[in-house]
Amino acid sequence: MVQSSSRLAATFSAQHAPEPALPRPGQSLLDRIGNTPLLRFDQLTAHLPGVTLLGKAEWHNPGGSVKDRAAANIVAEGRLSGQLSPGKILLDATSGNTGIAYAMLGAAEGFPVTLCMPQNVSAERKKILSAYGANIIYTDPGDGSDGAIRMARELAAKHPDLYFYADQYSNQANWLAHYHGTANEIWQQTEGRITHFITMLGTSGTFMGTSRRLKELNPTIRCISLQPDSAFHGIEGAKHMATAIVPKIYDPKLADADIEVATEDAYAMCRRIGRDCGLLLGISAAAGVFASLKVAEQLELGKEIVIVTILCDSGEKYLSERFWTEK
């Protein structure tokens, strides 16, 4: 029997059709943001029966800090809204980690980045930003992060067509990254057993977003914010709210308590964790562990307590600081 030309063509096409494409191996940069591990600090809580102290190790993000989460969401929302359009420069004020995240994303996705930051940020942060090709405008170290904010606002107002002003201190995409990501990860990783959430305030996005979602999941979770104990401190990225420009996304009513941490206590905890736990933590991360221990020591012991703090970054960006070698 002679087959029609159309049937022959169909048979040939079926026999020689390309096989379905397999999923591509590997992951993109964005795929690696989030889902960071929880690390136990059993060495520090041996004298506290029933207490589990956990730190969310945010240096496992590709940019090395918790700020990858907010930066990626801010960039995504900027593109979606059309504000970060082709040819525009992303502009923001930063104490370092968010800037590193912006610079990393800009290099990967092809948009230029200009950052305003205090001159006295760690040497390691400056080198990382240069390696990513970001344009840096340094501000007076005495003005802290507020000086960088004022500079960024001035540039954005003067050149609105040139810049997409990301404004992490006011951008709702900042805290929403933690509402949808960080909080749900913590809930799942602790199997809903978390009793306390403790972290340092900077932009306040991590605390705001994570606390809002955790309170929805279990209103009895105690959410405790941390601040430096004075306007002049050495905890990079942290804000002393009473003397600083208060971020628009910050709502103090969300905290069940607020604890002040001295720079010296954070430094001492950096050293202790390095020598007793084998982890090099950033200064604000160590401040979180210090405060978490203080909270745990004041609780009624014997019942299960699960405290989670955010380890914002590792100590690698601070190794040029002198406190590591102090006794």
What annotation goes with each model-predicted range?
Residues 1-327:
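PLP-dependent amino-acid enzyme catalytic core
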